[in-house]
Amino acid sequence: IDALKTRLGDVALVVCLDSGAGNYDQLWLTTSLRGMVAGTLKVEILTEGVHSGDASGLVPSSFRVMRQVLDRLEDSATGRLLPASFHCEVPAERLAQARATAAILGQEITQRFPWAHYDCGGSSAFALPTTQDPVQALLKRTWEPTLSVTGAEGFPALQDAGNVLRPYTAFKLS
C-alpha cells in the first residue's frame, strides 16, 4: 500500500479475497477460519538406501513408521484428528452463520472443487467429499481441525524407483 500511496490515495479499507468467496453474486465476509500449524515430519531409519531384498523384513520401512506416527494424530478411517487440544466448540453465532450460508450456497459448497472421477471398466468410481451436508461442509472447512500432507521427500519418481529400501520419509504437514 505504501508503494502505491500516490496512486491509491488515502486508503481506509483493504479487502482481501484470499479465503474464498461463496459465489460472485454477493460480497462475502470471512468470520471463521481455523488456525494453521505447519511443519516437516521426518522418519529416518538408514543413512543410505539399501537393497530391499536384503534388508526388508529386518529394517523397518520409514513409510510404515511414518504411518504409525500419523495414526497417533489422525484416525485414518475418518480423518478426525485425535488430540482433544485441536478441537473446540463452535460458538452458537458462528453455527447460525454457517446455517445461513449453507442455505444460500447449498451443494455449491462441495461441487466447486475439481473432484476426480473415472470409468473403472463400466462401474464409475468417484472421489467424494467427507460430507454431503452443506452446514457440516462449511464447519469442516472453517472450524474442524484436519491434517494435510502438502509435500513429500525421500521418494524417487515412479520411473526411477527400484528395489531399494529408502533411508527416510519426510512429509510437510499442515
Stretches with model-predicted labels:
Residues 1, 17-22, 45-47:
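Acidic, glycine-rich active-site loops and adjacent beta-strand->loop/helix elements
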Residues 6-9, 22, 26, 31, ...:
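Acidic-enriched catalytic cores of C-N bond-cleaving enzymes acting on peptides and small amides
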Residues 47-53, 158-159:
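Short small-residue beta-strand/loop micro-motif enriched in glycine and branched aliphatics
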Residues 37, 42-47:
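Short, small-residue-rich loop/turn micro-motifs
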Residues 27-31, 158-163:
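Short beta-strand/turn micro-motifs at beta-sheet edges
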Residues 41-43, 169-174:
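Short, hydrophobic beta-strand segments
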Residues 1-14:
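Contiguous, small/hydrophobic- and glycine-enriched helical/loop subdomains that border
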Residues 58-59, 159-167:
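Short, solvent-exposed beta-strand/turn "edge" segments of beta-rich domains on protein surfaces
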